């Protein structure tokens, strides 16, 4: 009888260790990074404006800045300006930008969570980026001003529904 109790205890002990080990493995899979940028400068306030010459320079600068970051997936909304912002880096990396809906930030966040072990770039808009970052679990970031195009958010997954974000500036374009 004591042997059975010892055996059960031993099995429970082993099961506990395996469960703890799987938890550590699951947690360590959340090692991905998401770079998030607003589209570059545009020519006008029209709904689907194209990039200005300065915006095209910034898009090239983005490709140079993140070209060696190990990006595996690129998301951009369907607007011309976001696609144009993503184009130089997609070309440099040999990737295609996956088009996402402008306002459906929840769907994008769901996709990003399934890629929590990857390095991803998101090209979006001033009014959606803060919401995406908050929904990813990094808290709030300052609103993006209408004339602000140089913010580069670097989000790092720390768990399935959490992460940390650092805000950088890139490309001091004239």
Predicted stretch roles:
Residues 2, 26-27:
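N-terminal pre-catalytic segment of deacetylase/amide-hydrolase enzymes
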Residues 2-14:
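Bacterial N-terminal signal peptides that target proteins for export
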Residues 15-16, 26:
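Cleavable N-terminal signal peptides
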Residues 29-116, 128-174:
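Active-site-proximal alpha-helix that buttresses catalytic centers in soluble enzyme cores
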Residues 119-120:
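Compact alpha-helical subdomains of small soluble proteins
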Residues 123-125:
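Short beta-strand segments
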């Amino acid at each position: 009888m004591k042997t059975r109790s010892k055996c059960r205890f031993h099995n429970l002990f082993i099961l506990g260790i395996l469960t703890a080990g799987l938890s550590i493995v699951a947690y360590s899979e959340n090692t991905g990074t998401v770079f998030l940028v607003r589209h570059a400068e545009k020519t006008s306030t029209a709904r689907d404006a194209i990039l200005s010459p300065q915006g095209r320079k910034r898009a090239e600068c983005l490709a140079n800045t993140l070209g060696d970051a190990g990006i595996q997936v690129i998301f951009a909304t369907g607007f011309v300006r976001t696609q144009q912002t993503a184009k130089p880096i997609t070309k440099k990396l040999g990737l295609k930008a996956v088009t996402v809906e402008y306002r459906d930030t929840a769907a994008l966040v769901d996709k990003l969570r399934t890629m929590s072990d990857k390095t991803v770039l998101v090209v979006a808009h001033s009014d959606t980026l803060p919401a995406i970052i908050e929904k990813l679990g990094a808290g709030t970031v300052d609103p993006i001003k209408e004339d602000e195009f140089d913010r580069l958010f670097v989000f790092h997954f720390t768990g399935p529904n959490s992460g940390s974000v650092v805000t950088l500036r890139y490309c001091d374009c004239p």
